[in-house]
């Protein structure tokens, strides 16, 4: 897969008059950009320097994500490293909030209860890492019509609020990203 360079996108958006952008680290992983290599620090600092020159602010970022509740998920160690790297890069860019998806325990007969427990376990070290970088984690509402009759955890506002409320008793850098398109799809 070929993906435009982030630097080209920053320049084109600046020329078009944009001043605020989102940084999508999920695509940076999917399309195997320098983000996934040992050259990631040089790459992100080059983007930071260009964004400053072009007067572009990155207001938020989307972290790499995967279904961490799936015991058979491939490349977990690599993907976990990319989640943390997303936070590191966001911090370098001055991003205050990184958006990430919750996972779903599709194998559980008690999907909501078990998914919540696994999400809490997963997000604790992620939130600690993010706090050390002065970054917040915003868990995003999901949609699941494409996998019906199965369902995903955090497709409802109630599940998402419950998860974030539970995590916020221990962490002050967790919040919600409400994706209106996802919510509209679920109407």
Annotate the PLM regions.
Residues 1-96, 113-114, 124, 131, ...:
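N-terminal pre-domain/capping segments
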């Amino acid at each position: 897969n070929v993906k435009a360079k982030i630097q080209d996108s920053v320049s084109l958006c600046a020329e078009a008059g944009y001043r605020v952008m989102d940084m999508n680290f999920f695509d940076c992983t999917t399309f195997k950009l320098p983000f996934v290599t040992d050259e990631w620090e040089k790459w992100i600092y080059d983007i930071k320097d260009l964004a400053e020159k072009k007067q572009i602010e990155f207001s938020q970022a989307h972290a790499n994500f995967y279904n961490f509740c799936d015991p058979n998920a491939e490349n977990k160690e690599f993907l976990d490293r990319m989640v943390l790297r997303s936070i590191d890069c966001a911090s370098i860019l001055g991003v205050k909030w990184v958006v990430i998806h919750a996972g779903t325990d599709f194998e559980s007969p008690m999907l909501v209860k078990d998914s919540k427990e696994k999400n809490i376990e997963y997000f604790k070290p992620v939130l600690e890492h993010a706090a050390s970088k002065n970054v917040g984690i915003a868990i995003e509402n999901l949609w699941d019509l494409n996998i019906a009759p199965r369902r995903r955890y955090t497709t409802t506002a109630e599940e998402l609020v419950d998860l974030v409320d539970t995590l916020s008793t221990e962490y002050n850098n967790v919040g919600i990203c409400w994706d209106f398109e996802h919510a509209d799809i679920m109407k």
